[in-house]
Amino acid sequence: MLIIGKKLSPYALLSISGLLAASDQAVKWLVQQSMAYGEYVSVTPFFNWVHLWNTGAAFSLFANGGGWQRYFFIGIAVVVSIFLIKLILENRHKGEAIAYSLILGGAMGNLIDRVFRGYVVDSFDFYWRDWHWPAFNLADIAIVLGALLFVSSSLLGKKANTNAEPDGSD
């Protein structure tokens, strides 16, 4: 069951994270099996399906670091994942709990890549004319959506708290 009382089931939230990580790995496997490194397939006038590797962080930050970044980002991902699992188990607010679940799923998907491949496989390339957004993957999408959900639920939660009338209890 997804909802227990007013809380979301931590097992459902962790299952969502696992499903996201597994889906991310399935897409990456498909890309690696069907395309050579550096290959791209034009899908629309603004989107390519690509096979690229990223040894760095978002936007290839630290990609030319010489190898240390693999272990650094593995360590960061493990610490963040443990923290997110703790937050999911506490499950204070539904929107935030779902956000943590999305971020955890994305972090796990990219962590698996870093541990077993030494790099993250990217497959989505959006562009306009000659300008390309940095390539990304399903895990990155989950992380960004989770971050946006966290910010919006936090802001909406604060707005709801400021609009609530005092109940007279001190």
Curated annotation (Swiss-Prot):
Q: Which UniProt keywords apply?
A: Aspartyl protease, Cell inner membrane, Cell membrane, Hydrolase, Membrane, Plasmid, Protease, Transmembrane, Transmembrane helix
Entry-linked PANTHER family: LIPOPROTEIN SIGNAL PEPTIDASE (PTHR33695:SF1)
Q: What does this protein do?
A: This protein specifically catalyzes the removal of signal peptides from prolipoproteins.
Q: What is its main location?
A: membrane
Catalytic activity reported: Release of signal peptides from bacterial membrane prolipoproteins. Hydrolyzes -Xaa-Yaa-Zaa-|-(S,diacylglyceryl)Cys-, in which Xaa is hydrophobic (preferably Leu), and Yaa (Ala or Ser) and Zaa (Gly or Ala) have small, neutral side chains
Q: Which NCBIfam families match?
A: lspA, PRK14776.1
Q: What is this protein called?
A: Lipoprotein signal peptidase
Residues that span the membrane, as ranges: 71-91, 97-116, 131-151
Keyword Membrane carried by entry: yes
Q: Name one GO biological process term.
A: proteolysis
A GO molecular function term, named singly, is: aspartic-type endopeptidase activity
Q: Which InterPro entries does the record cross-reference, listed alphabetically? A: Peptidase_A8 (IPR001872)
What membrane topology is given? Answer: Multi-pass membrane protein
Instruction: Write the Enzyme Commission number(s) for this entry.
Output: 3.4.23.36
Subcellular location per the Swiss-Prot or TrEMBL entry: Cell inner membrane
Q: Which residues form the active site?
A: D122, D140
Q: What class of enzyme is it?
A: hydrolase
Q: In which pathway does it act?
A: Protein modification; lipoprotein biosynthesis (signal peptide cleavage)
What family is reported? Belongs to the peptidase A8 family.
Q: What's one GO-annotated cellular component?
A: plasma membrane
